[in-house]
């Protein structure tokens, strides 16, 4: 009898909340968009391996924006640069909150910048900014970190060239490079490029990304049936890897002689007034956040950039010529503007293969209005609290209305007086990644060294596939190429 009553109550809740709610809040039901099924929403219309391409299909059909349900979540997808600016930048206070899935929240535990509330995010970001503004490292020390870790990478690639008849698969080496850079930045400790700790950290970052993708993230009704033991387990595993280094710095910390990013974060904790908003318990999460976010985004950009340069010898040669013409063997960050072609090429790779083709969604925390001049039908819409806002960077990046010959790799679109359509590297608005400038600087130094030292050629002159797949981020099929060491004389 009791079981029957429970089933009836759950059924009523299910029908009320999930089957009858198909975008009926405020103006959402008026917004055009695909048909949404109960529970699934429009997930049926998406290709799992080419998720970003499915957005292109709706872009062509609905233009500026449309309503869609991802599982049980109401979403407005913004397609036009004008509309993205209007909502995400001009009304940023109303869409400040991130959408955090139950999996991300479980990983974050209230102490990670990747999965915290707006108030917590402001607190954590302010802490990071203050830590690094006090940081005496500056550009010169970052230059040293990037160059030192790159040199280990270069020597490793030379060994692979000799042992594999010049055939190298670069993706795993780029990942090791980013891990070694982040580790050195955090702890001021050098690891050998083949140190098992690098691979262990890499495995953990990939496990965390993979484990934070569960059915309950899109369909909360299944959350009570979901286990998060895998997330808890890999977080403990990764913490165990960094714990010895963290404990060492906590014991040996010299307040007057900070040597690395961790030292400066410890100083910042000590400088806080009571009660302390940030404690030592936050430190492991800051360290893990940087490994997880930095490795996937930066290494993936390195992989795509080198792949496209391998297919474009003329462009590869142009970049090397620019590097040689400036005449600086070891480029430094202060000289970055002397390399317009390289900088523009990095922007162009982010346009063609954005790591996050669909920019991280925001949650409407105050009702927002989509002004009628951006509406295809000349209307205005009030978007209610709780709706997800999804900026669709990928589709307008390939729209000839905004980019001439959008399928062509053409860095000239970002050089000189050419107008720049809204360019989104990893994100946009006030909730951008606090380490974004670190990643851009890292890419500049690595590429400035890489294309002076090596030439990349397709194997047997067969162009490498540039087809993109969505697996956590946009990535190519695994590829290899011929790597030829250049003569610096």
Curated annotation (Swiss-Prot):
GO terms for molecular function: heme binding; iron ion binding; oxidoreductase activity, acting on paired donors, with incorporation or reduction of molecular oxygen, reduced flavin or flavoprotein as one donor, and incorporation of one atom of oxygen. One of its GO terms (cellular component) is intracellular membrane-bounded organelle. Heme binds at residue 433. Its EC number is 1.14.-.-. One of its GO terms (biological process) is xenobiotic metabolic process. SUPFAM superfamilies: Cytochrome P450. Keywords: Heme, Iron, Membrane, Metal-binding, Monooxygenase, Oxidoreductase, Transmembrane, Transmembrane helix. Its main location: membrane. The chain crosses the membrane at residues 1-21. Pfam families: p450. Belongs to the cytochrome P450 family. This is Probable cytochrome P450 522A1.
């Amino acid at each position: 009898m009791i079981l029957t009553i429970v089933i009836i109550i759950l059924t009523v809740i299910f029908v009320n909340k999930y089957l009858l709610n198909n975008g009926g809040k405020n103006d959402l039901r008026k917004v055009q968009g695909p048909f949404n099924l109960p529970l699934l929403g429009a997930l049926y219309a998406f290709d799992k391996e080419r998720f970003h391409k499915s957005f292109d299909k709706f872009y062509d059909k609905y233009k500026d924006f449309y309503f869609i349900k991802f599982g049980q979540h109401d979403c407005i997808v913004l397609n036009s640069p004008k509309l993205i600016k209007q909502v995400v930048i001009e009304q940023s206070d109303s869409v400040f909150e991130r959408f955090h899935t139950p999996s991300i929240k479980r990983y974050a535990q209230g102490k990670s910048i990747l999965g915290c509330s707006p108030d917590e995010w402001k607190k954590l970001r302010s802490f990071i900014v203050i830590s690094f503004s006090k940081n005496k490292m500056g550009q010169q020390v970052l230059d040293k970190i990037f160059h030192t870790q790159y040199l280990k990478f270069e020597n490793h690639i030379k060994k692979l060239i000799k042992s594999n008849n010049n055939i190298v698969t670069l993706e795993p080496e780029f990942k090791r490079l980013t891990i070694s850079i982040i580790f050195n930045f955090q702890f001021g400790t050098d690891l050998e490029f083949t140190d098992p700790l690098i691979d262990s950290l890499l495995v953990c970052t990939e496990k965390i990304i993979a484990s934070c993708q569960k059915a309950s993230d899109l369909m909360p009704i299944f959350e009570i049936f979901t286990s998060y033991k895998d997330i808890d387990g890999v977080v403990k595993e990764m913490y165990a890897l960094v714990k010895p280094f963290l404990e060492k710095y906590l014991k040996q910390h010299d307040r007057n002689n900070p040597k690395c990013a961790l030292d400066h974060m410890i100083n910042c904790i000590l400088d806080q007034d009571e009660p302390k908003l940030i404690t030592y318990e936050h430190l492991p999460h800051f360290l893990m956040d940087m490994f997880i976010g930095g490795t996937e985004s930066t290494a993936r950009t390195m992989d795509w950039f080198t792949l496209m340069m391998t297919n474009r010898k003329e462009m590869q040669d142009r970049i090397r010529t620019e590097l040689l013409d400036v005449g600086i063997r070891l480029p430094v960050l202060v000289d970055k503007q002397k390399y317009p072609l390289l900088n523009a090429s990095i922007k162009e790779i982010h346009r063609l293969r954005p790591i996050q083709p669909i920019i991280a969604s925001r949650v409407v925390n105050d009702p927002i209005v989509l002004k009628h001049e951006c509406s295809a039908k000349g209307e205005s819409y009030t978007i209610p609290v709780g709706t997800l806002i999804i900026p669709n960077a990928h589709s307008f990046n390939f729209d000839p209305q905004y980019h001439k010959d959008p399928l062509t790799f053409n860095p000239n679109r970002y050089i000189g007086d050419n107008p720049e359509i809204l360019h989104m590297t990893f994100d946009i608005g006030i909730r951008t990644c606090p380490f974004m400038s670190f990643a851009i600087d890292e890419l500049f130094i690595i590429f400035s060294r890489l294309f002076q030292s090596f030439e990349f050629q397709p194997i047997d002159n067969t162009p490498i596939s540039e087809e993109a797949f969505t697996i956590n981020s946009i990535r190519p099929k695994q590829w290899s190429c011929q790597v030829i060491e250049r003569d610096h004389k």
